[in-house]
Amino acid sequence: MYKYKIIFIILLLIICTSASKSEDIKNNIETLENYLNTIQNMSFTFEQLSPNKEKEIGWMQIEKPNKLRIEYKGTNDLIILSNSYYLILYKANDDIITSLANDGPWSILTKNNLKFGLDKNNLDTNGVVSNVKELKINKVNHIFYEILMRNQDKQLMPPIILHTSSNPFKINGWTIFNEKNEATKIKILKQLSFNKKSLNENIFKLSEQDRLKGDVWEGPFNKPQ
């Protein structure tokens, strides 16, 4: 009889622990949703570590919905722009434009009214949270979310791992993976603005006139015109 009591207590503890963990995950997902959905626009500098281990410093400006601009410090002449339809890659030195479908895990920063879930079969969500890990680093609670965002066809894309911390809740960076499972890591260095009341919409444009003049840079870096 004593043995069965012990087994019952152990099973009860496992069930309670599992229920508590499930509730923690739901709370963490809700916290992330609420934070991301408060973002209207945001700019920051970042450090990028590419699959080839090359480090670069960049600047990103986002505005919802679907607008993004990225520039890099130094000799890297790449400018990345996005709108509701296209992701535009512009090589300034050669004046070459490449347009791609604006479908990628970066949409976690640019979509409105994000909703995440745990069920891969629920097509009403923007993404599926496949894993959540909490770590205490220097007395600060860090939460890592592994999320599979959906593309425009509702298909799940390669994961983005979002690194956040609490008090106050903020995004510290993320890791994205290509089709070969190679990782590109982004670390936010400094937030420059958050929900600015007035934003120059020309930031997200690249006019032919500016291209001809070579006047294409909008970021904080001292780039040659």
Located regions from the model:
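Solvent-exposed strand-loop boundary residues in beta-sheet-rich modules
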Residues: 50-52, 93-95, 180
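Gly/Pro-enriched, hydrophobic low-complexity segments
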Residues: 117, 122-219
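Sec-dependent N-terminal signal peptides
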Residues: 5-15
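Short, solvent-exposed coil/turn segments at beta-strand boundaries
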Residues: 38, 61-67, 82-86, 164-171, ...
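Bacterial Sec-dependent signal peptides at the C-terminal "C-region" and cleavage site
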Residues: 15-24
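An acidic-aromatic
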Residues: 60-111
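A short, Trp-centered hydrophobic/proline-enriched beta-strand micro-motif
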Residues: 34-54
